[in-house]
Amino acid sequence: MFFAAALCCIVSAVMVSCGKDNPDTPEPEPTPDPEPEVPVTPKDTVVYAVGQEAVPGKGYYYATIWKDGKRILLSDGSYDAFCNGAYADGETIYIAGCEATGDLVDDGYYEPYHQNVGVIWKFKAGEEDKAEKTVISDGKYSTSPIAVTVADGKVYAAGFDSPDYDRRAILWTDGQPQYLTDGTTDALAYCIYSDGKDVYVGGYVQPASNKQGGIATIWKNGVAQSLTSGNTVAKVNAICVDGGKVYAAGSEKESGGRWKGVLWIDGVAQDFTDYVGTEVTGLYVKDGEYVIEGNMTETNSAKDICPYIWTSAGAQKVAETTLCQGVGLAVAGNDIYVAGNEVAGYDSEYNPINIAYLWKNGVEQELEVEYKNDFSLWGVICAYVEKK
């Protein structure tokens, strides 16, 4: 599926002959000293899965990460919190998420609740207990940063807020928001990717002329590019840049219909599934070979949702689960990690049982949990850290 690059060194020997009786024969150039070899630092692959775990008896969640399966809490359980996405910049890890610590809302319909505030956690791998938290919204409106990246020394996050019924897509730069849409129609930002100094955000924008439609959209450095016309509902859920080409994976459907999977390469669409309820949450591309991750149904029934990956060779089911969504992808060498969430039934009090999974090459990995009936993942990354 993936092709490892091999490094070949070709050494040429040049024979120089000098005639002793010819005074015009130039002296040979001195052989330069060889460049010193730069030692390669051995690296370990560390896998971070991010999400949430229920605080027992409280009805809300801890913001939780799992480092190689070990559970680590980023919140103290005194309020609702969760992690949406992550990024590794060398050995520095960034987590995008939310905490319900904003303005109190009492609308008369529900129990009073606090608005979600957008946050970014930052820590060095191995120093998770020293995580620094940066709040990136004021708590006035519910705010959700979904994804995070780093480019040219700056931290970028993509997500949305909800000042009214229609949401606004947002790009944050070092905590400062740039509104990609103005809120006059609905819009969401689902993903972010950096390539050099360029930052790409993927999502959707509802056209003003068709409230039943949705335009799959990429914002490059804040400038929007529409991938669809708005006559259908379409969205970009994951972006990669490889070989100078921009790959965007997402879904498209007719209003009221079922989703099909779409991969856009430099804006040109190619379908990778039929209209079978396909959702995308991950994309990896190297040397033109892609891996798309998400879920789809096999029988057009919502009860038959399974996690999948798609490559140029076709579709591959990740696990034999039902009512299970694929929610995250990471690739390290030839290893493929997929995160998923399953609705596994109901407990004795008719509360849904939510169980998260992390698979490595299709094999379930152990996740440490204290409350096994209600925990979820929303992303997974691989970090490369120096061997101790």
Specify the residue positions occupied by each region the protein language model found.
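Bacterial N-terminal signal peptides that target proteins for export
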Residues: 1-4
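Residue-level hotspots at or immediately adjacent to binding/recognition sites across diverse folds
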Residues: 39-388
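Bacterial Sec-dependent N-terminal signal peptides
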Residues: 10-45
